[in-house]
């Protein structure tokens, strides 16, 4: 038994300079796991609750001392002496003790930090890398793959202070033979994009996720400058590199219409916005669109899935919020064909693994994702490999909070070699 002997919670700082929760779980034998909770900017209304103090005199109300107190108090007391290898049991104790549907008593930030720290401590006690322990928890021991990265090289929406409505314009180096080469390709395009933007007199400051955040004439112009950068880097768009977008459409959904500032404040219906996106997919090799409509617009999503679902990957983020109850309903209604996995949306490792399994069993793809507020914690890299999810979204080629995940993936690929293939385009729904 890997008995838990000490649990520590503390307040640390995330990549936006806001506080977040870090937890340590100590086991008999000196094994320690440490993990931090990330934090989102464009959040789904049905996400598990991130507990903030609300004391305006401290961190502008964003302090997390209440969540930290939950870790050091009731959570620690409840799991001391328990077996860290029983991840589902540890998570259940915390969830039951919290006693709310959305973890609002202790905060998903408290429960998740402990959940992940526990998994890391258990992995250490078994002498396993975290990805191998996760594969065992997932019921798929030894089954690994390296994920195709979605690299967010132009940031808009809630992630940047610019006039671009669509939140993320991403490249996927699908033609790479390995993850390491995919990272190289992404890096080269990123640097060529800076040159393209500078040549047009545009800003090369970066947004929350490390992508450039220029003001552009339209949303389509973001795709045009990326296409130029891909060509300048010596790659073929559509063959070596495909494109993906995160609309985060809930952020510009007003009174039943999609209002795009970058398109002259034009208001679109669900059907019109679906066809606006469809036109972009005809002009550019966009193979994945995330949150193409508002999280509550299920009727619109059914239409969008009918129009685009057999051609491209339609990813639900705010739509599904990593929640199996909501995902189950989406699967039954034929809504989207992929889920974005953010473990702080649901608040525990066990529930995250359940969402990935449900998606895969239904023929949906699962894209492992960071949040816009991140730390140096690279657990999502191990999660992507350990579940053989196939795709990962972890930002651009700048900011250490993003690059930490790519570097961890490079290390894992080196360790696993041929045991963890990089499957490229085949991982993306509709592209096999």
Curated annotation (Swiss-Prot):
Its cofactor is Mg(2+). Mg(2+) binds at residues 246, 290, 317. Pfam families: Enolase_C (PF00113), Enolase_N (PF03952). InterPro entries: Enolase, Enolase-like_C_sf, Enolase-like_N, Enolase_C, Enolase_CS, Enolase_N. Transmembrane segments: none annotated. One of its GO terms (cellular component) is cell surface. Coiled coil: none annotated. The gene is eno. Binds a second Mg(2+) ion via substrate during catalysis. Pathway: Carbohydrate degradation; glycolysis; pyruvate from D-glyceraldehyde 3-phosphate: step 4/5. One of its GO terms (biological process) is glycolytic process. HAMAP family: Enolase. (2R)-2-phosphoglycerate binds at residues 167, 342, 371-372, 393. This is Enolase. It is an enzyme of class 4 (lyase). Keywords: Cytoplasm, Glycolysis, Lyase, Magnesium, Metal-binding, Secreted. Its EC number is 4.2.1.11. SUPFAM superfamilies: Enolase C-terminal domain-like, Enolase N-terminal domain-like. Gene3D superfamilies: Enolase-like C-terminal domain, Enolase-like, N-terminal domain. PANTHER family: ENOLASE.
């Amino acid at each position: 038994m890997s008995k838990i002997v000490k649990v520590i919670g503390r307040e640390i700082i995330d990549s936006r300079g806001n506080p977040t929760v870090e937890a340590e779980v100590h086991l008999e034998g000196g094994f320690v796991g440490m993990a931090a909770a990330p934090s989102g900017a464009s959040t789904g209304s049905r996400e598990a609750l991130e507990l903030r103090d609300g004391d305006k005199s401290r961190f502008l109300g964003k302090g997390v001392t209440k969540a930290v107190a939950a870790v050091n108090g009731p959570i620690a007391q409840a799991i001391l002496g328990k077996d860290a290898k029983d991840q589902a049991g540890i998570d259940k104790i915390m969830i039951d003790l919290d006693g709310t549907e959305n973890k609002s008593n202790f905060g998903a930030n408290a429960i998740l930090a402990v959940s992940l720290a526990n998994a890391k401590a258990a992995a250490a006690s078994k002498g396993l890398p975290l990805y191998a322990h996760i594969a065992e928890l997932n019921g798929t021991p030894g089954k690994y793959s390296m994920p195709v990265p979605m690299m967010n090289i132009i940031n808009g929406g809630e992630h940047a202070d610019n006039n671009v409505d669509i939140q993320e314009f991403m490249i996927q180096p699908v033609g790479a033979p390995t993850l390491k080469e995919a990272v190289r390709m992404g890096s080269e395009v990123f640097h060529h994009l800076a040159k393209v933007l500078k040549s047009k007199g545009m800003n090369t400051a970066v947004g929350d996720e490390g992508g450039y955040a220029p003001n552009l004439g339209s949303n389509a112009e973001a795709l045009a400058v990326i296409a130029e950068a891909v060509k300048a880097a010596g790659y073929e768009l559509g063959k070596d590199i495909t494109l993906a977008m995160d609309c985060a459409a809930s952020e510009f959904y007003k009174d039943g219409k999609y209002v795009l500032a970058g398109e002259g404040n034009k208001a679109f219906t669900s059907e019109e916005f679906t066809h606006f996106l469809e036109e972009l997919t005809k002009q550019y090799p966009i193979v994945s669109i995330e949150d193409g409509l508002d999280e509550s617009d299920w009727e619109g999503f059914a239409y969008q899935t009918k129009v685009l679902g057999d051609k491209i990957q339609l990813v639900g983020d705010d739509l599904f919020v990593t929640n199996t109850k909501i995902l189950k309903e989406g699967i039954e209604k034929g809504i989207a064909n992929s889920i974005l996995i953010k473990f702080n949306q649901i608040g525990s490792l066990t529930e995250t693994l359940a969402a990935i399994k449900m998606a895969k069993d239904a023929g949906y793809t699962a894209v492992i994702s960071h949040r816009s507020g991140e730390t140096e914690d690279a657990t999502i890299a191990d999660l992507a490999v350990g579940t053989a999810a196939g795709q990962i979204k972890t930002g651009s080629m700048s900011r250490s909070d993003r690059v930490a995940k790519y570097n961890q993936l490079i290390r894992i690929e080196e360790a696993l070699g041929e045991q963890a293939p990089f499957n490229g385009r085949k991982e993306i729904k509709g592209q096999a």
